[in-house]
Regions:
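Conserved beta-strand positions in the central sheet of alpha/beta enzyme cores
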Residues: 1, 23-25, 51, 89, ...
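Active-site-proximal loop/turn and secondary-structure-junction residues that shape catalytic pockets
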Residues: 2-3, 27-30, 56-58, 94-96, ...
Length: 219
């Protein structure tokens, strides 16, 4: 998202303020229809990762056919990106944790991922009914980045991939074990962890979240 600016203008602004993008976003359709174009865009930004945050599906009906199609597209696009030194990462939103055979649809994705990894959004993992730390233990080599977003206490999750942005709270003040997740991810060599806050209180909350992260003792 370039906030309405032309890409060249946006990149100039990043350069002016010495902001170096680690990752850029790409839609499912972009990866399906023009993965080479996605790779070139990432190279223009100097990004090492491309993240896709949504697999299209009708309403709340996400199933194994959607999952298999996505895995095929991600593996194909990921191979093209990999040739340019770029890693493709999928950002799960919780609807992937529906039961499938002896696990979940997410398990199918993780076990068949040849050319893509995971950007773990700890809010959506939790909201979808899974435990981020358990998932890090189960797939230690699959996670390459984290979105750190805490969930207000008392909120009950589901696997729709939908929740009010106002349920985003200061890191460490919600129901998610942010400290434990950060420590586990650090132990596993995850280098990039991004604070994400989509609430209307973001300006006030992010400094507090950053202060909380700085208070975590990493050994």
């Amino acid at each position: 998202d370039t906030y309405g600016m032309e890409e060249s203008e946006f990149r100039s602004l990043l350069k002016k303020y010495e902001l170096n993008p680690i990752s850029i976003g790409a839609s499912y359709d972009e990866l399906k229809d023009d993965p080479k174009g996605v790779a070139q865009k990432a190279l223009r930004y100097g990004a090492r990762f491309v993240m896709c945050s949504w697999i299209p599906h009708k309403g709340n009906r996400f199933d194994i056919e959607n999952t298999k199609a996505a895995v095929k597209i991600f593996n194909k696009a990921g191979a093209i990106l990999k040739r340019e030194g770029i890693t493709l990462a999928y950002h799960a939103h919780g609807y992937e944790f529906r039961p499938h055979e002896y696990g979940t649809l997410f398990d199918y994705m993780a076990q068949n991922a040849k050319n893509f990894s995971l950007e773990m959004d700890v809010f959506w993992i939790t909201h979808g009914g899974e435990d981020p730390i358990s998932l890090l233990d189960k797939y230690p080599d699959f996670v390459v980045m984290l979105h750190l977003k805490d969930m207000e206490k008392g909120l009950k999750g589901n696997n729709t991939g939908s929740a009010s942005v106002e349920t985003n709270v200061v890191l460490g003040q919600g129901q998610i074990d942010i400290e434990g997740i950060v420590r586990k991810a650090h132990q596993q060599g995850v280098r990039y962890m991004f604070i994400e806050d989509e609430s209307s209180r973001v300006i006030n909350q992010v400094p507090k979240s950053l202060s909380f992260l700085r208070s975590i003792s990493i050994k």
